[in-house]
Amino acid sequence: MVFYLVGLGLGDVTDITVKGLNIIRRCKKVYFENYTSLLSFGFDQTQIEKFYERPIIEADREFVEQKIEKVLEESLNEDIALLIVGDPFGATTHSDLLIRAKQIGVSVKVIHNASILTAVGCTGLQLYNFGSTVSIPFWTDNWEPDSFFEKIIINLNNGMHTLCLLDIKIKEQSLENILKKRNEYEKPCFLTCSQAAKQIIKIIERNKGNLVVNADIFVVGIARIGWDDQKIVYATLRQLAFEVDMGIVHW
């Protein structure tokens, strides 16, 4: 029996490969991982099940982190698919799943698809000229991590571009709800290009005089790549932060 990691691409349900669709329709169970990314319409279980012609089980962060072992064990006796937006290896979480499955003797097959890691080529920037990819997290009132910025500077000094992946929060709990053990979740939220640019400018201001970069450096902002209304903007970091409206990232 096989545990399938099936990439769905970047747009909607129709972006799946023919191979991936055939696998979904013959698997005993099908799970949809919905916390590392989302399709253009969010997680609409009815729409997904109608197109794939299969019952779909939602796999949120809590499920993948705490209950996936049972799914892997079931894969020893039946074919199971985990659907992943983009390409299965676009997030380290899924690489870990592959390793864990192999450790208990589960056969794993991967069905690849489009990923933002390659689709960023739509900006006109050459993929060969990208350095390390970074993730920019949401800042809070008392937590402003900036370790990602060091990689941006290293790439810049080496004449390389940096792909910055912006944070998303899907079905997550507040610290208060976690401490009080309340099964309540925050509304989905997505870090925008504007917010990320403002955070970077704040980091630059903290290190004023020690950097060769400033808020007038040119950057490319991209949103909803692979969707019908994708947007690409070339502007200064300052313009992206305060003047450019990239629109909503998701619904």
What kind of feature is each model-predicted range?
Residues 1-107:
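Class I S-adenosyl-L-methionine
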Residues 2-4, 28-29, 55, 79-82, ...:
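Structural motif
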Residues 59-61, 111, 222-224:
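Conserved beta-strand termini and adjacent loop/short-helix elements that scaffold enzyme active sites
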Residues 62-68, 116, 171-172, 227-229:
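A short acidic, often aromatic-flanked loop/helix-cap motif at beta-alpha or helix-coil junctions
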Residues 86-162:
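Class I SAM-dependent methyltransferase SAM-binding "motif I" and its flanking Rossmann-like core
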Residues 79, 156-251:
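A contiguous loop/helix-start segment that scaffolds small-molecule binding in enzyme catalytic cores
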Residues 69-77, 122-127, 144-151, 178-182, ...:
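Short, surface-exposed amphipathic charged segments that create phosphate/polyanion-binding patches used
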